[in-house]
């Protein structure tokens, strides 16, 4: 099958080459690359044309990454579709091959796996993220690694586009729709994608948490007090983590992260 990989770009000249290179070196070659560019003013377009001359490229004004992704999904001709952000990259050359081989069973609706966060400034890897899909776990906190989700195009069409009224958490909303359905999946154990930590500021975290709370209440209004407990607990924990980092007590954060998830949240739900 053909696999469509959608990348939204905006002044991504510093990072897009590594993203494209990671696609070009994939062992599986039946790939459709789609770039949706928000009228970049740097060399982003030039790099895309040089490194991915056969790619589908659209450069026009949009209102954010999720509107761009929706445009890409509409254009996609592949039977399987997914995204690769402009500052992220595939971790090895067999990622797409592993994705496609997972769909050899016609009953499979989507594939997902793990990501590895990295710091662009240092190049150092930070930590893994992503676990087997679970609606219950995702209602506590985002647990499915959205960048790794590659889905049958017909399933995406059934679920509908990203709700781009959410600035940051539209992927959370879309993943909840996916998990609320009875869809069959394959979870890939080996980390698939390196994801940049850039831009994950405390301010963005707060907005993301607020949007996630609103999304949860949209689907489960009867659980309002439970979700509010989770929201305030996680927000205070994030503030404490940021303070520890500012005080250069990063080792404490690393120890806490090691034990993250050991205490069950299921009693709250």
Task: Label each residue range with its predicted role.
Residues 187-188, 205-210, 245-250:
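Short, structured secondary-structure boundary patches
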Residues 220-269:
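Membrane-proximal basic amphipathic "stem/tether" segments
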Residues 1-204:
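Nucleotide-sugar donor-binding/catalytic module of glycosyltransferases
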Residues 191, 195, 202-227:
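Catalytic core of nucleotide-sugar-dependent glycosyltransferases
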């Amino acid at each position: 099958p053909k696999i469509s990989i959608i990348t939204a770009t905006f002044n991504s000249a510093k990072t897009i080459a590594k993203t494209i290179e990671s696609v070009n070196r994939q062992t599986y070659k039946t790939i459709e690359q789609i770039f949706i560019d928000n009228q970049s003013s740097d060399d982003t377009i030039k790099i895309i044309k040089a490194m991915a001359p056969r790619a589908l490229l659209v450069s026009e004004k949009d209102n954010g990454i999720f509107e761009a992704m929706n445009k890409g999904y509409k254009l996609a001709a592949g039977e399987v579709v997914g995204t690769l952000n402009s500052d992220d990259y595939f971790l090895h050359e067999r990622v797409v091959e592993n994705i496609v081989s997972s769909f050899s069973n016609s009953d499979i609706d989507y594939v997902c796996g793990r990501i590895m966060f990295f710091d662009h400034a240092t190049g150092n890897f930070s930590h893994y993220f992503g676990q087997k899909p679970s609606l219950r776990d995702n209602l506590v906190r985002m647990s499915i690694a959205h960048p790794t989700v590659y889905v049958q195009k017909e399933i995406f069409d059934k679920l509908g586009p990203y709700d781009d009224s959410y600035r940051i958490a539209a992927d959370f909303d879309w993943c909840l729709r996916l998990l609320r359905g009875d869809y069959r999946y394959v979870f890939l154990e080996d980390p698939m994608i390196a994801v940049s930590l850039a831009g994950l500021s405390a301010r963005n975290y707060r907005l993301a948490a607020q949007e996630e709370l609103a999304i949860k209440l949209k689907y489960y209004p009867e659980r309002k007090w439970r979700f509010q407990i989770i929201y305030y607990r996680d927000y205070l924990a994030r503030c404490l983590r940021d303070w520890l980092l500012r005080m250069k007590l990063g080792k404490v954060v690393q120890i806490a992260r090691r034990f993250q998830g050991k205490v069950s949240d299921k009693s709250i739900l």
